């Protein structure tokens, strides 16, 4: 049996308890591996949830710093196996997911990334990591995020905690994907090994705050040593994120905030895309 660690970050609240146990079950059901489950708890942790979880074959670590990135980084520092994975507390590993990933590790591979199934409202869509991603992962990332929480397996001595600590809120796995494509050897396996529940109630990506996190997160991506053509594509996404934040603030009745975001979009290289919005916003932006 091959040892592997799976990190499950969670706030361990009663609202997440059922899906958290579902995630744990999906790891314990893995064949041909010996999984160690590290549950990294932080935030509004519920003592009852933790007590019931402690009755299962998991190791619970408490992170004093709030936030997803901090919880994962804290747990990565405790990994003592050659390989580790991360799994969000509302997602599931598919059967034989870990064995399939381990089978693809050659000595020169730092990360194995697989396809995954995205589930929204009971409708499943396979997110592929086929030839387009394999041929140019940086460009592919500007079109669709090919790395999801839970779709990768990492070599511990190559991918350390600082990668996860640096992940910006709202764009964690996209940012990590860029970093991996820039600096590490990735093996892509175009076989789904993860069921990603994109519509779990309370998920941060479904909250309006997620929109307002995008500009800062994309700004962090822009600080990476991206090739010129990729840099231009990310700059375009950055400008679009500023505009989206402006629109959302306006719809919420926050005219001054809408103007602040809009003015920032006009300071980008793609200002001309949003200039006409100025005349529309002007008579409607009084708080």
Task: Write out the residue ranges for each language-model feature.
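Short, acidic, metal-binding catalytic loop of nucleotide-sugar glycosyltransferases
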Residues: 25-34
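Glycine-rich, basic loop-to-helix element that forms the pyrophosphate-binding segment
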Residues: 63-79
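Catalytic core of nucleotide-sugar-dependent glycosyltransferases
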Residues: 141, 192, 196-199, 205-232, ...
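Flexible acidic/His/Gly-enriched loops in nucleotide-sugar-dependent glycosyltransferase catalytic domains
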Residues: 55-58, 65-70, 98-159
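Conserved nucleotide-sugar donor-binding catalytic segment
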Residues: 133-209
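Short beta-strand/loop segment that forms part of the nucleotide-sugar
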Residues: 34-44, 61-64
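Short aromatic/hydrophobic "clamp" motif used to bind/position activated sugar donors
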Residues: 84
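N-proximal low-complexity "stem/linker" segments adjacent to membrane-targeting elements
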Residues: 1-26
